[in-house]
């Protein structure tokens, strides 16, 4: 089954990985800490913590760092003052965007998020304005060159919902969010190490963009991801490999 290439998106993100690694790790640690605080430090009994750990491992975070974050969250600390908030809006070209945040000051966060939208030619919407366009699911992505038949057999047996092979040979394994970490663990045990793995909001219908609009949308996403309170940004933009290469 062919589809748009998530691998192109990953390559774009990897190009900025070194500069943003510290910020990415900060966000991952925050998610682990909050997940442990809300649901306890036992990952087997805490699906959210299990998913957070799986994502951290996929981003090459050390087990020691992960364990410290779990202990910190389960023990209770300043993270008790942090709350989760979600903002929805539209970017250039009418692209739908969801922004998940963790903050100890809602007024500060909404001001920063609104400013990013406004400066980039978008606008912050109301709750529910775009969320209906997305489905929450786990996506485990593999670079071109992986044994497609073997991966498909293991993934389906482990409970994957769908497997999509893209034109460039990259493969996405889709899972129910609750099964995400278990399926990823099975794949790792069988020797399939992913290039990216996350529980995300996946748009059912993608927005097709020209190069100019794609650059503006990417700039907005970068602005949002650079905000300290922002954990994740999701959009329905279809960043094809051709667009990624043109944007550079």
Swiss-Prot record:
Stored Pfam families: TACO1_YebC_N, Transcrip_reg
Residue ranges annotated as coiled coil are none
User: GO cellular-component terms in the record?
Assistant: cytosol
Q: Where would you find this protein in the cell? A: Cytoplasm
Chief subcellular site?
cytoplasm
What are this entry's molecular-function GO terms?
DNA binding
Q: Tell me which Gene Ontology terms the entry assigns under biological process.
A: regulation of DNA-templated transcription
Q: Which UniProt keywords apply?
A: Cytoplasm, DNA-binding, Transcription, Transcription regulation
Q: What family, per the record?
A: Belongs to the TACO1 family.
Q: What name does the UniProt record give this protein?
A: Probable transcriptional regulatory protein FTT_0655
Source species, please? Francisella tularensis subsp. tularensis (strain SCHU S4 / Schu 4)
């Amino acid at each position: 089954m062919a589809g748009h290439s998530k691998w192109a998106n990953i390559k774009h993100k990897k190009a900025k990985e070194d500069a943003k690694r510290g910020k990415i790790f900060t966000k991952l640690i925050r998610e682990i800490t909050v997940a442990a605080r809300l649901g306890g430090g036992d990952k087997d009994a805490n699906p959210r913590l299990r998913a957070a750990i799986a994502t951290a491992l996929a981003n090459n975070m050390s087990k020691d760092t992960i364990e410290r974050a779990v202990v910190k969250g389960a023990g209770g600390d300043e993270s008790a003052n942090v709350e989760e908030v979600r903002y929805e809006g539209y970017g250039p070209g009418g692209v739908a965007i969801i922004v998940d945040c963790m903050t100890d000051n809602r007024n500060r966060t909404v001001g920063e998020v609104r400013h990013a939208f406004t400066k980039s030619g978008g606008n912050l919407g109301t709750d529910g304005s775009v969320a209906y366009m997305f489905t929450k699911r786990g996506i485990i992505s593999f670079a071109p060159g992986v044994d497609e038949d073997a991966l498909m057999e293991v993934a389906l047996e482990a409970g994957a919902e769908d497997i999509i092979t893209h034109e460039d040979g990259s493969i996405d394994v889709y899972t129910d969010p609750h099964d995400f970490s278990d399926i990823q663990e099975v794949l790792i045990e069988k020797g399939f190490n992913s290039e990216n793995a996350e529980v995300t909001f996946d748009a059912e219908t993608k927005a097709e963009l020209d190069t100019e609009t794609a650059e503006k949308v990417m700039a907005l996403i970068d602005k949002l991801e650079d905000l300290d309170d922002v954990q994740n940004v999701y959009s329905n933009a279809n960043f094809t490999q051709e667009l990624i290469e043109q944007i550079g």
